[in-house]
Amino acid sequence: MSLKDFVLIRVRAGKVHGLLGKYYTWKDNPPEEITKLPVLDERIDERINFVWIDSPTPKVPAENFAVAWEGYLIAPMEGDYIFFIETDDGARLWVDGKLVIDSWWDQPPTVHHSPRVRLTPGYHSIKLYFYNKETFAVIRLGWIRPDGKAEIIPSTNLAVKLSNEIVVKGLPEDYTIELWAGEKIGSAKVVNGIAKIDANNILQPIDGYFKVHDANGSIVYTSPIIRDIWGGDEYEVAEV
């Protein structure tokens, strides 16, 4: 098979706007580490702006449930941000691994603010834990931006990658594909028609390109620059 008349096309983008939410249930007292509980449901929530008068999902009870949201915050500008949550009952918020709001107790709907958090433009890790005790729950996540705008954080400023692999399908057996962005980021050999590049260390989307080597090591294809390459991307060989 010759790749001279073929291109790689992205058939699935790994970057999705929102945060990955994992839903749990608990007994007795709300646990300090909810992620040690069995996961009842999992989904990507575009933004955190919920008032539940019943179960948050069909698989989760209306009482004694918890949610762990994780992903990335996309800061639009450099400056000091103040984060706020409205919660009923408890919640904790981390930005770049630092606990900035800790309100882990039973309470009616209450608004809590973080201290000022200095952010550079771009991607920052974010994690929000929430638990609810009785039927009726509230959880909202917002910010006050450096320009003074206060809002629930929009989905366009939240992102998650679908997996820690970049998958390429349709290349010949024993070919190798490399991902480059100034330097080589990763590579994988084609096995059973599929190459899987480890994207665990790609912490935010990158603009890069692929090089394809045949079984003898010769470069047979170099892609154009592709924007926002990230874990969960899937590519296929297509004829041109």
Q: Residue spans of the language-model regions?
A:
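Short, aromatic- and glycine-rich surface loops/edge beta-strands on solvent-exposed regions
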Residues: 1, 9, 128, 205-218
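Acidic/polar, compositionally biased interaction segments
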Residues: 6, 10-164
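Short, surface-exposed beta-strand/beta-hairpin micro-motifs centered on an aromatic residue
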Residues: 84, 194-200
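Short proline/glycine-enriched turn/loop motifs at strand-loop junctions of beta-rich domains
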Residues: 86-90, 169-175, 205
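Surface-exposed, short loops/turns at beta-strand junctions within beta-sandwich domains
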Residues: 120, 200-206
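Edge beta-strands of extracellular beta-sandwich domains
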Residues: 139-140, 215-235
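Short, acidic Ser/Thr/Gly-rich low-complexity loop/linker segments typical of extracellular
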Residues: 184-194
